[in-house]
């Protein structure tokens, strides 16, 4: 049975109605109806309801959001300041709004696809993002998200004990820079040096524990202890196997939700406790997305 709940909301006309909330899976994601993000960008009560739903479901989906770029940016800024992406430039008229275009002239390459959490190679990774589709392919182009709170909760107890207190290095080289020419890659890394974060971070709003490793994570920085390592050659095999195991938790379908975009669909996600994957299965069709990334805080 579909579990649909309702909360007060404001429709496009400005009259108060109810947000319809339909969970997409038992783990993560909810589809919202009867809410317009242009109105939410200006209405404190409505925005507070959407934000509370985001904390509960971790990623929210909406259809038929015929809003302007200015409204898109204004809504995203209710969560915090926006940041430019180092690889994809912002709209000159709307700083912080990034266009992600794929079409016939785009290279049909898959190297950029990986489960990841945005900008963990920064000292303060993004809080989250508001992504709107302005043109979608007839087939394909879905996105998936994974609940990294549940991924942590379902780890065996002995693994939780092993990773308690572990820290890890995150590098822009591990994904975006992987296919770049050496000089460009080194320049990018010089501009965005590696960051170090706890392997298990705490959600600053909910207090939940989060498994915080992803495709940008290169290695643990404090695995080399007398308990873990007898000799130097123990460090790499032991830590690499553990890191690969932890990174692979995002691949578990029970932790995931999958969303099919159409024109004016919007996804809003909490980057602190999720990972996502954009499926590249639609070339040479066109998919045009616009994303506002929100500056986050330092993981602890």
Residue positions per predicted region:
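Non-heme Fe(II) oxygenase catalytic core, chiefly the N-lobe of the double-stranded beta-helix
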Residues: 2-266, 271-300
